[in-house]
A protein has these predicted regions:
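Active-site nucleophile-adjacent alpha helix/oxyanion-hole segment immediately C-terminal to the catalytic cysteine
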Residues: 1-41
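Conserved active-site-adjacent core of cysteine acyl-enzyme catalytic domains
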Residues: 20-21, 32-142
């Protein structure tokens, strides 16, 4: 994933990646996503993303259902096996898209700020426990 230029745009980067990776919007850009999220109501340079439901709303503009859910490690792994999702930890204050699982069963992520708080392209169980308060915004597969 291309690195974020501004510190407050990780949620837009993750949403942009999800839209392009799933084919919902192959021509998406981060700037377009910032506008779709709602600048400055839902996202701005002072607070970043103010409400994860704004991501859910953007995804649902593409005629798919999305859900926001507080998740534990096992649920995150389950979602990563079955659908496209974005993760955020309230103690990490950073959003990433999930590519899937690694060969050893960790979360393989698309991270616009690699090594922020020592997390690169993988979230391990140790990272998960170290950065509590995880939520997922994901596409609901009917």
């Amino acid at each position: 994933m291309e690195r974020q230029v501004r510190g407050w745009t990780c949620s837009a980067a993750a949403t942009d990646w999800l839209l392009r990776a799933t084919g919902l919007d192959p021509y998406s850009t981060r700037e377009k996503v910032v506008a779709e999220l709602g600048y400055p109501g839902c996202i701005d340079e002072y607070s970043g993303l103010k409400d994860s439901r704004c991501i859910q709303r953007v995804i649902e503009q593409y005629d798919v259902r999305a859900r926001q859910e507080w998740v534990g490690w096992e649920r995150a792994l389950q979602l990563a096996r079955s659908t496209a999702l974005i993760l955020n930890s309230t103690s990490w204050y950073h959003f990433v898209a999930v590519r899937g699982l690694t060969e050893i069963g960790d979360l393989w992520i698309a991270n616009s700020a690699p090594l922020y708080q020592a997390v690169g392209e993988v979230i391990t169980r140790r990272d998960w426990d170290r950065l509590p308060g995880w939520q997922a915004i994901y596409i609901v597969n009917d």
